[in-house]
Structures are given as structure tokens and as C-alpha cells.
Regions:
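Acidic, Mg2+-coordinating phosphoryl-transfer loop and its flanking beta/alpha structural elements
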Residues: 136-167
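Substrate-recognition element of Asp-dependent hydrolases with the DxDx(T/V) motif
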Residues: 65-70, 75-107
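Substrate-recognition "cap/lid" segment bordering the active-site pocket of phosphatases
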Residues: 94-138, 143-148
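Short hydrophobic segments within beta-strands
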Residues: 6, 92-94, 140, 160
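Short phosphate-binding/catalytic loops that engage adenosine nucleotides
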Residues: 87, 115, 155
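Active-site neighborhood of HAD-like aspartate-dependent phosphohydrolases
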Residues: 1-53
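Short, basic/glycine-rich phosphate-binding loops at helix/coil junctions
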Residues: 45-62, 87
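Anion (oxyanion) recognition and catalysis
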Residues: 80-83, 111, 151-152
Length: 167
């Protein structure tokens, strides 16, 4: 089976790290003035930041957040089990689109843990076309909209939902 896998929020806990650091940035640096939706876990939807504030947050914190993120619980064991069962594991991720260094950080984390994948698609804006091209049987992603778009191509998806997200 060909299995497509996202990185952030699926393999690495970077989404939680981003949310925590964004809360601190908003509270400490922006004086807690920019919250649009308190119960919204996605940084891009939670805050009413200006374009400049978004860029400042990205410039200051994206790389550090990426470095301090950890593997999700049991993900290494599951990935190794899938590999041993003969499945093809294909990374399909947006990582590296905004900050190129984030790709190298993920590659280093994978190498350190001995995690190998059959193919890598970095900096992807949309994932559905790659899933079709690679004949993906199942795509694992934490973005609900990605799952819907991929499912429209008659590809099974596993929505790896963070407990804080309501979709």
C-alpha cells in the first residue's frame, strides 16, 4: 500500500509547539490584544494579526519551534511497523514552503531516529495532485481541508485530528 504522510501535526508535534509559542507571542509581545477566537486552536484562525505581525512571528519563531518539536507519541514505532509490513511511506508536506530551513530540521530529526521514507514531497501547496500522481491509497493529514480535497480524488484519508480541533 502507498501511504502518504504529513509531517507537522502527524509525525511531529510542531503544531502544538506553534500554538503555545503563538499564545506567548500574542500575550507578551502584542499585549493580548489580537485574539479573534479563543477556542480556535489553529494559529492562522485564532488571531487577528496584521501581515507584519504574522511575518514577525514567522521570522522570530518558526525555526525555533521546528527545532524544539518532538515526535508524536508512538509514531516511530507505527512508521517502522508499516515499513516492515512492506508499505511505501511517502512524505507529502507543506513544510519548507515558508521557511526552507524547516525541511533540513525534519530531515535531521528523521536521520537521527533512523526513519526512512520512500519519497519526499516538500513545500506542497496542495496535496491532492501528488496523491494521485503517487497512487496513494491512504493519506494521513491533520488538515481537514486537505483531507476533503484528497478524498474528492477517491483516495482514502485519515484525519489525524488534534484533540483541540473541532472539525
Amino acid at each position: 500500500m502507498n501511504i502518504g504522510i504529513d509531517i507537522d501535526g502527524v509525525i511531529l508535534d510542531s503544531e502544538k509547539v506553534f500554538r503555545t509559542v503563538a499564545d506567548l507571542y500574542n500575550t507578551i509581545e502584542l499585549n493580548d490584544r489580537a485574539i479573534r477566537a479563543y477556542d480556535e486552536p489553529r494559529v492562522q484562525e485564532k488571531y487577528n494579526w496584521t501581515d507584519e505581525e504574522i511575518q514577525e512571528f514567522a521570522d522570530k519563531y518558526f525555526i525555533e519551534c521546528s527545532k524544539i518539536s518532538n515526535f508524536m507519541p508512538c509514531v516511530k514505532e507505527v512508521l517502522n511497523m508499516l515499513k516492515q509490513e512492506g508499505h511505501n511511506l511517502i512524505i507529502i508536506t507543506a513544510r519548507g514552503r515558508d521557511k526552507k530551513e524547516m525541511r533540513a530540521i525534519a530531515e535531521e530529526k528523521f536521520e537521527k531516529e533512523g526513519l526512512k521514507f520512500d519519497k519526499y514531497y516538500w513545500a506542497q501547496r496542495g496535496k491532492a495532485d501528488v496523491c494521485v500522481k503517487e497512487k496513494i491509497d491512504v493519506m494521513i493529514d491533520d488538515n481537514y481541508m486537505n483531507c476533503l480535497e484528497i478524498a474528492e480524488k477517491n483516495i482514502k484519508t485519515l484525519y489525524f485530528r488534534d484533540a483541540g480541533i473541532k472539525e
